[in-house]
A protein has these predicted regions:
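Bacterial N-terminal signal peptides
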Residues: 9-20
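Secretory-pathway glycoprotein ectodomains that are cysteine- and/or Ser/Thr/Pro-rich
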Residues: 21-173
Length: 173
């Protein structure tokens, strides 16, 4: 008698828990009530990749650019970690327009990005903020992925919202 409703309730609870929702079941004098709540996080960065695609190979000396699409206007800072674990900023506060794909091919219109050693896998992170960063978070001297990510989060903390996206490529001779 109770097996079917209990199974249905368990299935419903599983669906909501997998969807990241909170389920509250409360007994009332003559009936049970079920309410749900959820938080939906919309990413500001909808696309981020190098011009040859995520995971592509580049030779030392090749030009490289990055395609980015955001849901709102703001600024992007690009940082990277080399195969040896060194972290660096190579573009800060690049303005982007929301709702359109843009190409970032240099820190300014007259400067481009060029592949340089060391060879091996590289990871680039785009940090989106609604306003300009002040540069107070320093990435020079930071080594290792976890410390890099902690610095990015520290930089984003000054803003009511922000987003991070990563892409990877390999550098060869």
């Amino acid at each position: 008698m109770f097996a079917r409703p209990i199974r249905a309730l368990a299935a419903l609870a599983l669906v909501f828990s997998l969807a990241g929702c909170a389920i509250v079941v409360e007994p009332w004098p003559n009936h049970w009530t079920i309410s749900t709540s959820t938080t939906v996080r919309v990413s500001a960065i909808q696309e981020f990749r190098p011009n040859l695609g995520h995971g592509a190979s580049y030779r030392v000396g090749d030009p490289i650019s990055f395609r980015i699409r955001t849901s709102e206007d703001g600024y992007v800072t690009l940082t990277a970690i080399d195969p040896d674990g060194s972290v660096y900023v190579f573009a800060r506060n690049i303005p982007v327009r929301g709702g359109r794909s843009e190409i970032i091919d240099g820190p300014s219109p007259r400067q481009g990005f060029w592949i340089a050693p060391p060879t091996g896998p590289h990871v680039v992170s785009a940090h989106f903020t609604p306003g300009r960063t002040d540069g107070s978070v320093v990435f020079i001297g930071v080594r290792g992925y976890d410390r890099w990510q902690a610095r990015i989060q520290l930089e984003l903390r000054s803003f009511p919202r922000g987003d991070v996206a990563e892409t990877r490529f390999t550098v060869r001779r």
